[in-house]
Amino acid sequence: MEMVEPDAHLVALKVMRLMRPTLVGLGPVVTCEPTDLVQRFSSSQESDGMSGACAETLAAGQVLLLPQSFGSIYLGETFASYICVHNTTPNPVECVTVKADLQSNTSRINLSMHENAKSPVVLPPGGTIDDVIRYEVKEIGTHILVCEVNYSTPAGYAQSLRKFFKFQVLKPLDVKTKFYNAEIDEIYLEAQIQNVTTSPFCLEKVELDGSEDYSVTPLNTLPNGESVFTVKHMLQPNNSCQFLYCIKPKGDIAKNVDTLRQFNNVGKLDIVWRSNLGEKGRLQTSQLQRLPFECKTLRLEVLDAKNTIKIGTIFTFNCRVTNTSEHPMKLNVRLAAKFSPDSQYTGCADFMLNLLQSGESAEFPLSVCPSKLGLVKITPLVLTNTLQNEQFTIENVVDVFVVNSDYDNDTTTHQNKLIRYESAASCLTQKQVQLQVV
C-alpha cells in the first residue's frame, strides 16, 4: 500500500457546469503561421498594388467559446452541473457518499444525486461515480453550490472533502404594465417587456393567464392571424416590445356592481424565452390587479348598436340604465340634437322612466337620423333624477359610421354590450411588476 500524505485525499472531486457555449468575437488577425490561409491571403494582398493599407489583417467572425467558469445564470433558467468523484489510488475506497446543496441568500436546497443507486458505494481503483444535477433557479442574487464527498480510508477513518462554487443569478427581463379602464366593462392591459441581458433572445410565448373571474382576449395578431411583429419577438439587449390584452369580467360578476368592486385580480403574465443558442427560460409575474372599480350613482349600457349605417336611415339603439346608488331614482331621459347646418344628426327624445329602486334597471330605445357622412357621435344624453334634483350627462353615448347609400358592407356587425359610467375618471396607471419562477 502506498503512503498517502495527511492532507491528500483518496478521491478527486470534479465539478463542471453544463451550459451552452457563447459567441465571442476574436477581432482582426494580425499574425499567423506561414502555412495558414490567412498568411497566403496577406501575401497576395501585399503584392497587389490596388489593395488598400492594412489589408494584411483579416477580421474573424464570432466563434463558439466553451464556459471557462461557473459565471452567471438568469432567473427562470435551469442550472445544470456535472459532478464526478474519481478514486485516484490503487486501493478501493469504501463508504463513498456524495451530496450537493444549492445555497442562496434565503434558503439551502438539497439537490438529489443517484436516486436509484445504493448509498454508500465502494469505489474500486480508478473507479468513478458521477451524476448530473439540475435545478430551476428561483431567486436573484448570489448562489453557492456546495459539493461534499464522504468516504472511509483503508484504515477505517472517516474523511470528508468539500468544495464551493459561487455564481450569480441575474434578472433577465423587466416587465412594466399599464391598465386602461375604458368607460365600459372592458379593461385593456399593455405589457412592456424589456431585455436586460447582454445578448439577444427570442420571446417564445407571452400569454396572460386570466383569473377565474375574467376572460382574456389577446390583441397581438392581425385579422388574418399573423402576428403584429415583423420579426418573431426577437429582442436585442435593452430593447423592448409591447403586448396588448382585452380583459372582461365573466357572467354574473359583470352584472353585479358590488361584486365587480371586489374582484380586482385579473391574472398573471406567463413569459417563455430562448437565448441565441436555444437556452430556455420561463418566468411568471405576480398577480396583476386592475384599477379600483368606481361607479358612483348610475351606469348606462348601450345594447345592439350597429357599427355602420347608410345615410338617410334611422339609427335605433337600445339602452339600459341601472341605479347603482343606495336611494331610489325617478329619471327623466333627454336627448336633444342641435338644429344647425353643422349638426351631425336629427332627432330628439324627452320622457320619464318608472321609479328605479337601488340596483334596478330599465331599458329604453333611442332613435336618430344621421345627416353627415363619416363618424357620427351621439351626444349628449342627459339623465335627471327628479326626486333628488340630480343631473347626469353622458358626453359620448355611442358612435356610428355613416356611409353612402351605395356602400356595400355587412351591416350586421353589432357592438357588444357597452357599459358607460357616470363621472368616469382617467383610468391609466403604469406599474412595474415582480417576476417569479413557475
Swiss-Prot record:
The lineage of its organism: Eukaryota, Metazoa, Ecdysozoa, Arthropoda, Hexapoda. GO terms for biological process: Golgi vesicle transport. GO terms for cellular component: Golgi apparatus; TRAPPIII protein complex. It comes from Drosophila melanogaster (Fruit fly). This is Probable trafficking protein particle complex subunit 13 homolog. Belongs to the TRAPPC13 family. PANTHER family: TRAFFICKING PROTEIN PARTICLE COMPLEX SUBUNIT 13. Pfam families: TRAPPC13_C, TRAPPC13_M, TRAPPC13_N. It comes from the Eukaryota.
